[in-house]
Amino acid sequence: RLDFINGAYLVVLENNLPEESIRWLCDNGKAPILADPVSTIKAEKLRPVLGKLAALKPNRLEAELLSDMSICTREDAAQAARKLLDTGLGTVYISLGAEGIYAADRSGETAWVPCARCTVANATGGGDAVAAALAARMVRGDSLAETARWAVGAGALACEAETTINPAMSWDNIETILNRR
């Protein structure tokens, strides 16, 4: 199984795994890992391995927990991102709900992508759509800003559906949402 994992372009780690499994994957896996903390309760399991992750997608509360600071402003988001990157983490995409995404990487590149205009029918599934778009765009080799932009669009499109998974999810429909601005 490790050969299969190591052959991946990217491993998406959903934080419902036991802590020992997360540590094993981070210690033994060679493929880059994008982790989604899932919740503040489960986010703590990622603290010991932050420096081994290629990317992290916390929401505001998860980023506050992992950076040990409150995020009330854009400057706070930037400072929290720096604290997380100081652990050795490669890239962080802090999802700030209606305020969009603040992204930063170890090279010093940053991006603030405002939320795409949408009519929210159901926010459940929005974060998962953001994580999926981040993974897909990272694998494509998009820039930090473009990756965050597509993720914002995917989250907005997901939230427009009354169901958890929007059956209209596609790159074309995400682009339509992004062009509404």
Name these PLM-found stretches.
Residues 2-5, 58-61, 133-134, 142:
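A short alpha-helix capping/helix-coil boundary motif
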Residues 1-10, 27, 172-181:
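Conserved N-terminal subdomain of the carbohydrate kinase-like
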Residues 8-79, 99-101:
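Conserved beta-alpha-beta core of the PfkB/ribokinase-like small-molecule kinase fold
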Residues 42-43, 47-48, 74-181:
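Conserved phosphate-binding/catalytic region of the ribokinase-like
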Residues 5-9, 33, 67, 117, ...:
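A near-ubiquitous, low-amplitude feature marking generic local secondary-structure context
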Residues 1-3, 18, 45, 122:
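Poly-acidic low-complexity segments
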